[in-house]
């Protein structure tokens, strides 16, 4: 009886990641008997025994224990600790990303075939020097484009990573279409392939940079290197599959340009659709201007804060990667004031670490940030600017803002700085509630993805100034 009781009483337990825990019981002979029924998915369906040290070497010992579950394809292609080590949107994004990569690989094979044909591969009249010159012009154009685009938009890619990711893949399709059409017009071949390579280099900058931003979002255990490495492994596997299919596809389409073009259009449609689904699956938990607009509008109209899932589902993807002209954060102070009187007007009523100038006629807001302005101050400044824009609209507003909007519309037109001062008082009541609602809904307010320039300023403030 005592032995039976010992066999039934768990001595300890263990689990791998978030998997099912297994218990360990004492067997009658003093060995440890581990349960493995919870690991049936890995092909284990019976208990195994670990013998004490010094027992019969012919019996099953510690070496007979099964290897940890993370020993198959999951270990090769998924980050360690999956799914707990990555964001909840990791799997749907990676699945659709693999589909788009496969379609892009096949389209790329068709484009490469067309470029080689245009350069003169298989043509006895083509010269090596002409082909080399074409290739050098194509590559040098792309290199210059890469540098210029990285300088022009590099600092803006974090703010709208999803939109730029989609833009990069669509531009890649355009580049491959140019390559396919290049041999049709031999006189413009060099210019066409150079333009195509320029577009592809822009794609490499935008796509690579936004992929890095998405890796930061997906990695939940400071495992960005692991997530990036496994993403590369997945992409390599997909490209290998695409290469094998291309070997079968190219002989079928090489003699029929119309069929080749039809295959390209089909693969392009699949590529764009899969990209859209992949980007739409992402749930970013930090606020950029587009998501802040959606969340603030919903809050002002209904008094509720949208959670990240709902806001990301509503976020526009086909637009949004160009900065909206209605809100500019981090502008230089000299752009807004040219006299002591204008500076006094701008500072009056501002007890926060920012100065806000509102152009009512064009509904444009420009914000000067103090040296001490932190993420929450910037978030408040952006909320303030978007709230001023809401005064120009016709939708429902909270009672405090509705009263202010009615006063602005009923009486003579007020100076912008007077309205800004009054909205500061309203925001003092609304913003703490809004900020708490954001945090309760799951938004990460300690950081943001708002587009902010590097200009900072200092000015004389009232003693009641608050620094967030």
Curated annotation (Swiss-Prot):
Keywords: Acetylation, Membrane, Phosphoprotein, Transmembrane, Transmembrane helix. The modification N-acetylalanine is found at residue 2. The chain crosses the membrane at residues 247-267. Changing residue 43 to E: In a breast cancer sample; somatic mutation. It is found in: Membrane. It is a single-pass membrane protein. The modification Phosphothreonine is found at residue 49. The keyword rRNA-binding does not apply. Its main location: membrane. The keyword Plastid does not apply. PANTHER family: RUS FAMILY MEMBER 1, RUS1 FAMILY PROTEIN C16ORF58. Belongs to the RUS1 family. This is RUS family member 1. It comes from Homo sapiens. The lineage of its organism: Eukaryota, Metazoa, Chordata, Craniata, Vertebrata. The gene is RUSF1.
